[in-house]
Structure formats: structure tokens, C-alpha cells
Regions:
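Interdomain hinge/linker elements that couple catalytic modules in large macromolecular machines
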Residues: 134, 138-182
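Structural recognition of the conserved hydrophobic beta-strand(s) that form the central parallel beta-sheet
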Residues: 100-106, 127, 136
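Walker A (P-loop) phosphate-binding loop of P-loop NTPases
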Residues: 13-14
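Short hydrophobic/aromatic beta-strand immediately N-terminal to the Walker A/P-loop
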Residues: 6-10
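Hydrophobic positions on the alpha1 helix immediately C-terminal to the Walker A/P-loop
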Residues: 20
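Short regulatory helix/loop adjacent to the ATP-binding pocket of P-loop NTPases
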Residues: 92, 109-125, 137-142
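Conserved lysine of the Walker
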Residues: 17
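Short glycine-rich substrate-engagement loop in P-loop NTPases that contacts/grips substrate
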Residues: 39-71
Length: 182
């Protein structure tokens, strides 16, 4: 993973952003980044009662005090749209080179022009969409790379297509065998 700037991840709810961020943390750890240099905060945690930039700074200060990161820490802020003013805090942290930051959220504020202006030149955008049908098949352990792969598997592919159309294309649905009522 390369981190030239902060990273903004925006995609719909249940599309796997928390999972992807945790994979990023794991990958950094595998690449030799010390665990004390990795901080993951989920702002939907009910233990956070007042969500503002003061809380973000308190979290960062407590993290530094107790884990003593060396070098530049990586901070992952999940569902950051819950915190009023978070974008100014991220900009300040980036400008002061205090951390490399990944933010994720699932509302329109993360996509706003105002936010793009506020973080211009300071971030990269990563947008993840729900699964394509081919990805959905792969999640269900079926690989279809050519028309020959379909031969003799039409019934199973049709069953999965029905599931894809009826249930949606989010990873959680693809991995579930449960049928849900709407």
C-alpha cells in the first residue's frame, strides 16, 4: 500500500468498507508496520456519546500516550460522517503530518463538492461499488471466465442470477445462504 495523501473511501452501507479498511490494517501489519502505529476507530460505537473534533483529538492523544507510536501512525476512521467537523480535523492532521488517514462513510456529505474543496490535494478517493455478477459468482465459488465455463452449469448460474436479482449484490448477501423477507 502506498500512502501519498489521505484516503477517502465512500460507498453505500453494507458494501464492505469496514471489512476493506480492516484488510488495509492487516496488510500494513504484514508489511512490517508495527501494531502500535495502526489505529482503527468506528464512530458508530455507542460508547462515543458526543461526536465532535474535540473527541477525535482526545482519541488521538490517548492513543499516542498509551501506545507510543513511532514514526507516522496510520489512522482509520470508519463512519466518520457521524462526527461534526471531521474534515477540518483530517485536514489539520494531514497538514501537520501527524498521521496518514483513511476515512470512510456512507452518506452524501462524503461526496459533497464542499468536502472535495476542503480536502483538495490532500486526499485520494476510493469508491467501491456493490458486486458485479461475475464477482457475485466468485463469492459463491463459481468461476466463469469464458463461455466454455458455462457449459453444463446453466441451472446453477440461473439460480445464482435469481439470488443476485432478488437479494442484491452486497458481499453479505453473496455469502449468506439465508433467505430474507423484504
Amino acid at each position: 500500500l502506498r500512502w501519498p495523501t489521505s484516503l477517502r473511501c465512500d460507498w453505500p452501507r453494507r458494501a464492505g468498507k469496514s471489512y476493506l479498511m480492516r484488510q488495509m490494517v492487516r496488510k500494513l501489519s504484514e508489511q512490517g508496520v508495527k501494531k502500535e502505529n495502526l489505529l482503527f476507530v468506528n464512530f458508530e460505537d455507542p460508547r462515543f456519546t458526543s461526536l465532535d473534533t474535540k473527541l477525535m483529538m482526545q482519541i488521538f492523544e490517548v492513543y499516542k500516550e498509551f501506545l507510543s507510536p513511532t514514526g507516522t501512525p496510520y489512522i482509520f476512521l470508519d463512519e466518520v460522517q457521524e462526527v461534526e467537523g471531521w474534515e477540518k480535523w483530517v485536514r489539520m492532521m494531514h497538514e501537520l503530518k501527524k498521521a496518514k488517514i483513511v476515512v470512510s462513510g456512507s452518506n452524501a456529505h462524503l461526496l459533497s463538492l464542499e468536502l472535495g474543496t476542503l480536502l483538495t490535494g490532500r486526499h485520494l478517493d476510493l469508491t467501491v461499488f456493490p458486486l458485479s455478477f461475475q464477482e457475485f459468482l466468485a463469492f459463491n465459488k463459481m468461476e466463469v471466465k469464458s463461455p466454455l465455463d458455462v457449459a453444463g452449469r446453466e441451472a446453477e448460474i440461473n439460480r445464482l442470477m435469481r439470488k443476485y436479482i432478488e437479494s442484491g449484490s452486497f458481499p453479505e448477501v453473496a455469502l449468506s445462504d439465508k433467505k430474507r423477507e423484504i
